[in-house]
A protein has these predicted regions:
Chain B
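Short, charged beta-turn/beta-strand-edge "cap" motif at the junction between a beta-strand
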Residues: 40-42, 83-88, 246
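Local cysteine-cluster metal-coordination motifs and their immediate loop/turn environment
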Residues: 107, 184-186, 205-233
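Short Fe-S-cluster ligation motifs
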Residues: 222-229, 233-258
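FNR/FR-type flavoprotein reductase catalytic core
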Residues: 65-210
Length: 310, 258
């Protein structure tokens, strides 16, 4: 059986499959459930400075098994209350990564300091939510903004900092480079693609917020391209996320350059048992293809262009 | 995945509950719920209180702004429906005790009808604050169920909580299954009353919901998600769930006392 354990962003993971932020993750029992089902680690819901109810429903639209559109609006219990949920997950033995969102570098730093005291092994900065005014992409849409936020946080905490960047700009690799300059230990890519659904009978957007973010198998090729381009630009590890539903998807991301992976929408489609299945199937696939360790496959597709890169 | 349907009928059931009827062809099992979308307002999880082929209905209790506005929907107005979601009640048992408080009858009445149609006997312990609030009392009687009533103010039936009626019935008569829906304190008492009587208790649970798909975690209840693991829970699955009867979660995910 191929070795699935990886070291990414200074963190040892028992396998590369992390629960993506925003899926489950509001309650400690759910985080523990994903861990117990075999996730290599769990990333919390993005936590802010104060409790936030999120948008009214509808907050979600689904498309069979190829996609899921959401604009939850960053609901979260706030940093005062959330540590008790992390504690529940940690008591279950989970490797927990704390996701935070804020409106400016100073707030990010304050929040990061508090999240870092909860026992999380690393932070993931949400610089990429496509549908929350004043947060996410709005504070992480340019390389300059990404660098400022990441630098403010890395100066304030000692644990590894992961920057989750948006695919909704022309140059995701530029954002990743900026995160690296700011001191990030890794970048995760991608967050959801900005998207919308319209109800033709009612002549209105389906989601209460109008715009949302698309996830699921539909976005896998886009996520892969982002990881591919980022891997060629940065030297820090890349965490691949976007539409991973089976072991082949996972290995495509790894070969494009991802050292760890996040899984979200597939948890919605298959339940949390997806983690055990992905780990087992990836190990078999690596065996079949002659890799002793998943780390040996990271980025191997690069340098194999049939046409020279431009 | 959503259907937009026109409401075909609006029925005032009690002073605090209103039923909206509509046609929605998806097959539903008794105990399942749908997401009811009020365009421009919000979307709510609602048990199907009527499910007879394509003819469906939901019964809404006024508890907040959106539910109040949902009650004012008129015949001809359009709403969005998605679902049905969740698990369902097994209507095979022969002797069923239904314990319903407040608007709990809405979740259990279609299952009781199904059980009666299959030849089962149904006894209903029905509770409300006062007589006019007894939801579906006549409907239960019309399906051939025996109905035992309790009201907080004594305006009909036993004065006090419906759990007193349920305890008496469980102590004196044999049942093959107990279905309960209503305030969680009530359901907890029903579970206690059935302990040691080797009769399984099934609770229909309610939590704040957003996605209804097992993604967003809004309806987390211990290790479960009410939207996909419920809404029906056998009592033993709730035994170690600390939040049951004590806490729910608000829209931000904060645990708040019930």
């Amino acid at each position: 059986m191929a070795e699935l354990a990886v070291r990414c962003a200074g963190v040892n993971l028992r396998n590369p499959f992390l629960l993506a932020s925003g899926v489950w993750g509001e309650s400690g029992e759910s985080l523990a459930g994903a861990w117990n089902a075999g996730a290599g680690g769990v990333i919390t819901k993005s936590i802010g400075s104060v409790p936030r109810p999120g948008y009214p429903n509808p907050t979600i639209e689904t498309y069979e098994h190829w996609g899921l559109l959401n604009a939850m609006g960053l609901p979260n219990p706030g940093i005062d209350e959330y540590p008790r949920e992390i504690e529940i997950a940690r008591k279950a033995g989970a490797t927990v990564i704390g996701s935070v969102f804020a409106g400016d570098p100073e707030e990010f730093a304050r929040l990061a300091v508090r999240m870092a005291t909860t026992g999380v092994v690393a932070l993931e900065l949400n610089l990429s939510c496509p549908h929350a005014q004043g947060f996410g992409t709005e504070v992480g849409g340019t390389p300059a903004d990404v660098e400022k936020v990441v630098r403010a946080v890395t100066r304030a905490v000692t644990i590894p900092v992961i920057a989750k960047i948006t695919p909704n700009t022309g140059d995701p690799a530029g954002l990743a480079l900026a995160a690296e300059r700011g001191g990030a230990a890794a970048v995760s890519a991608i967050n959801t693609l900005r998207a919308i659904a319209i109800d033709v009978r009612l002549r209105r957007p389906v989601l209460s917020h109008g715009l949302g973010g698309l996830s699921g198998p539909a976005i896998k090729p886009v996520g892969l391209a982002c990881v591919w381009q980022i891997f060629e630009k940065v030297s820090i590890p890349v965490i691949g996320v976007g539409g991973i539903s089976n072991a082949q998807d996972a290995l495509e991301y790894v070969m494009a350059g991802a050292r760890a992976l996040e899984v979200g929408t597939q948890v919605t489609f298959d339940g949390v048992g997806v983690f055990g299945r992905l780990a087992q199937d990836l190990s078999h696939l690596l065996d079949e293809l002659g890799f002793a360790r998943v780390e040996d496959a990271v980025g191997v597709a690069h340098g194999a262009h049939s046409v020279p890169p431009d | 995945m959503r259907s937009v349907v026109a409401v075909t009928e609006r029925v005032v059931e009690t002073p605090s509950t209103v039923t909206l009827r509509f046609s929605y062809p998806a097959t539903a099992d008794p105990g399942q719920f749908v997401m009811l979308w009020l365009p421009g307002d919000d979307e709510l999880p609602m048990s199907l209180s009527y499910s007879d082929g394509p003819s469906k209905g939901v019964t809404i209790k006024a508890i907040g702004g959106t539910t109040r506005r949902a009650q004012s929907i008129r015949s001809g107005d359009r709403v969005g429906i998605r679902g049905p979601y969740g698990n369902h009640l097994d209507t095979a048992p022969k002797r069923i005790l239904v314990v319903a408080g407040g608007s709990g009858s809405a979740a259990l009445a279609p299952a009781a009808e199904r059980a009666r149609a299959a030849g089962g006997s149904v006894t209903v312990a029905l509770g409300a604050t006062q007589a006019p609030e007894l939801l579906f009392k006549e409907r239960f009687r019309a399906m051939g169920a025996r109905v035992e009533v309790a009201t907080d103010d004594g305006s009909e039936g036993t004065k006090g909580f419906v759990t007193v009626v349920a305890e008496r019935l469980l102590a004196t008569e044999p049942f093959d299954a107990v279905w309960t829906c209503g305030p969680e304190v009530m359901m907890k008492k029903v579970i206690v009353a059935a302990e040691g009587r080797s009769v399984p208790v099934f609770c229909s649970m309610e939590r704040h919901m957003k996605c209804a798909l097992g993604m967003c975690d809004a309806c987390a209840l211990g290790p479960y998600h009410v939207c996909v693991d419920g809404p029906v829970f056998p009592a033993q699955r709730l035994a170690n769930v600390h939040d049951f009867g004590s806490f729910h979660r608000d829209s931000s995910g904060r645990r708040v006392p019930l």
